[in-house]
């Protein structure tokens, strides 16, 4: 039977069919759905870990114990997981270990555009790169096999388009893969210097063996057509190139690290001109040039963003197809917090107070955009807490006018240790944890503070208050961000305090089931004075018509925040 599947769903299917029994992940676009789809299979144990480092360590432990395992994350998540991943490359595996890492060319939902192949090369971990959903399924199964055959973790590198595009996938029955017996082996699994030195030699030999395997594998196919143009491509870039220059000769790389030297040389010898088409970093291009081959790549193709069929066609053939354009372009719709978003109240107060805000990764990062513009920085998960300490060290005056904000899931991910750092080093800083009872931006995933597992089972719920108190924070308070006056007083008081403090801004995400508001809200035209204070909260339901604010009832969910900022009391709940 065949089924239309997202690339991410096909990966989950491949895990099921290949006998991968354990998956530990942290949600991150565009990788999130892999673990969510995998959780639907009864034969797979799937969990959300507090962060990617923990997820990879869980998967490594399961693999060494004898069960095929996987961990899934986005590209910046692999930075977090690098510590165990790099050393797991030395230890190798017992049962198959697959690391699914999704890159984000074009920065659809990320803070940078890094190429996972660079880290994989540094870690000496092989990389498989599918170009469609069928290959997603097939390559996961192959990854598990290669992992055991070559005693190595294997990275499955995705891109946003492969992860979120659909194509037909043939469904197969799952393999019966029993757990392998565990044998105590300190020389392999205890990476003290003496053992690690021996394992490093093993890793270098493993790469040579895999390079030899890459010379004849079916996932690196050669297609000779018109010999004037030869294209070496991988991943989604292969699909674009194939559509742009269908008559060209192709070397499609399914294994993008380590690369096959002889296969590439032989292909280049058969064509007049070689183009290397790869999104982001020129990894394959640099390898070809290292071999002394004359290839064309980033000198005509971009180092940045996503590719397209049109871009490649223009670059290689110099042909620019006529593209339909409208006489009038639709206005750009910027990303914005949802109607009823609990973070809106917190941002409104912080903007009003004029404090410096070190921000973090999540829905609340949108507070950096107009009209709020309350966030000053956004670097990575948990950085807000470390940076508020850094601000205070640079100038103690910042302690009186700077706060860190981060979400509940982000705090669990990477916010606890920097808060400990503030306490340990006698710092002064105010941390605001925006607790909306869910991991919001990646699509409502559970986390350790929600009380539910990935599969919806009730579990231990971590109390943010008790956690902060347990590490030594004496000033911990919970506030409702829609109580604007109370929230403002709390921020003023805690920022002025000469010691570390935590404000937990607690109100559930407006999109959660069970969250109810009083009802639709409207503006009384007779009372409205046109001050536009309600526009300052940035609610998409409030628009200007003829210079006066109007509430769009199709978008308004009745949260009532606009009522709280309206001084003339012109906004009220409809009868």
Each language-model region and where it sits:
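Flexible, low-complexity linker and terminal segments
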Residues: 1-8, 17, 130-337, 342-343, ...
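Thiamine diphosphate
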Residues: 1-133, 161, 224-225, 290-504, 514-515
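Short beta-strand segments
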Residues: 72-73, 98-102, 155-159, 232-233, ...
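Short helix-loop-beta junction
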Residues: 37-43, 241-251, 466-472
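Short acidic, glycine/serine/threonine-rich loops at helix termini
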Residues: 34-37, 60, 81-85, 107-114, ...
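A glycine-rich helix N-cap at a beta->alpha junction
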Residues: 43-50, 91-102, 182-185, 424-437, ...
